[in-house]
Design a protein with these regions (language model features):
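Periplasmic-binding protein-like
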Residues: 1-18, 26, 66-67, 104-115
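Secondary-structure end/capping motifs
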Residues: 16-97
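Conserved C-terminal helix/tail region of periplasmic/extracytoplasmic solute-binding proteins
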Residues: 86-120
Length: 120
């Protein structure tokens, strides 16, 4: 299933006490994701440190083109994403093996939805 990768995470207390900061972080993430989905190869290369290219700009750009489709254009957590992440975590974190976790309580798309509207 879909595997969440670049995410913002914190304690719910921080979100409750700092909604404006939380929204600003979500705005930045969604804005960056939208840019990444539209950026051309030359735009990408201009922003990436030379050391990331590992001496092969063409290979880096080819790899980028292959991974681009996996980038979320709106920053929303896919419905099946948390379950996929939990299954993966349980494979190497023994303390989670027998835990029942209400995944709906572990994330919110509210901030990403507002950011998506802002940058639509």
């Amino acid at each position: 299933g879909p595997m969440p990768a670049a995410v913002l995470y914190t304690h719910s207390k921080f979100v409750q006490e700092n909604p404006n900061t939380t929204q600003a972080l979500a705005n930045a993430m969604v804005h960056a994701l939208r840019w990444l989905t539209k950026a051309g190869p030359s735009d990408i290369v201009k922003t990436v440190p030379e050391s990331y290219l590992l001496g092969d700009r063409a290979l880096y750009l080819a790899a980028w083109e292959n991974v681009r489709q996996a980038i979320s254009p709106d920053g929303l957590m896919p419905e099946a994403g948390p379950a996929t992440a939990l299954r993966m975590l349980k494979t190497f974190e023994p303390s989670l093996a027998d835990k029942s976790i209400d995944l709906a309580k572990t994330y919110t798309n509210a901030f990403a939805r507002r950011a998506d509207v802002k940058y639509s």
